[in-house]
Regions:
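...captures the hydrophobic TM-helix bundle architecture rather than a specific catalytic motif
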Residues: 1-190
Length: 190
């Protein structure tokens, strides 16, 4: 009688760590957006319109979701050059997103909407804190993309191990979805 080994569909420990980290990020942004809603009801709240450049940055980050997914696909197919190319394009789109966000901040400041100082108000402070925290997470993702990209060039690289790009893709899609949520929240609720 042959012994049958039952294999369970287990989640890789690194994926569990990632999910736990993403959960904590969700809680942080849920707290910030909840505080935003509460604070908005106060009399000193100043409503203002988001710069149109935030719409462009939203399109850019959505495109980056496509390119990171293509990187995963090419990695699983064992096509290293296209894989590296899609990683590079994703990183470039991430940098473009950050630059567009910065441009949006400069447009806000040009319209006398500032984070600190005599021109500051609660609405602007919340906007800047929420978007800057998101930008830091995008920056972390861009750094991770470059790390995975350069590791793929290493002689020790195992092309069959797609876990790094899968983890990266999960994080990147999360950051993209988080921005969509924040953009919709700030645009329609803000």
């Amino acid at each position: 009688m042959a012994t049958e080994l039952k294999t369970k569909n287990k989640i890789h420990p690194q994926k569990m760590y990632l999910y736990a980290g993403l959960g904590s990020i969700v809680m942080m942004f849920a707290g910030l957006t909840s505080a935003y809603i509460v604070k908005k009801s106060q009399s000193n709240w100043l409503d203002f319109e988001l710069p149109k450049v935030f719409i462009i940055s939203t399109v850019v980050i959505l495109l980056s979701s496509f390119t990171i997914q293509m990187a995963v696909k090419k990695a699983k197919e064992g096509l290293q050059n296209p894989y590296r190319g899609f990683l590079s394009v994703t990183a470039i789109l991430g940098v473009v997103f950050m630059l567009l966000q910065y441009k949006g901040f400069m447009m806000l400041q040009a319209n006398n909407i500032a984070l600190t100082g005599p021109k500051s108000n609660s609405a602007a402070s919340f906007l800047f804190v929420i978007t800057i925290l998101h930008l830091l997470h995008v920056l972390g993702g861009v750094i991770a993309i470059f790390g995975v990209r350069f590791k793929s060039l290493s002689a020790k690289n195992n092309p069959e191990n797609t876990l790094p790009v899968e983890l990266l893709s999960t994080y990147w899609h999360f950051v993209d979805i988080l921005w969509i949520y924040l953009f919709v929240f700030l645009h329609w609720i803000g």
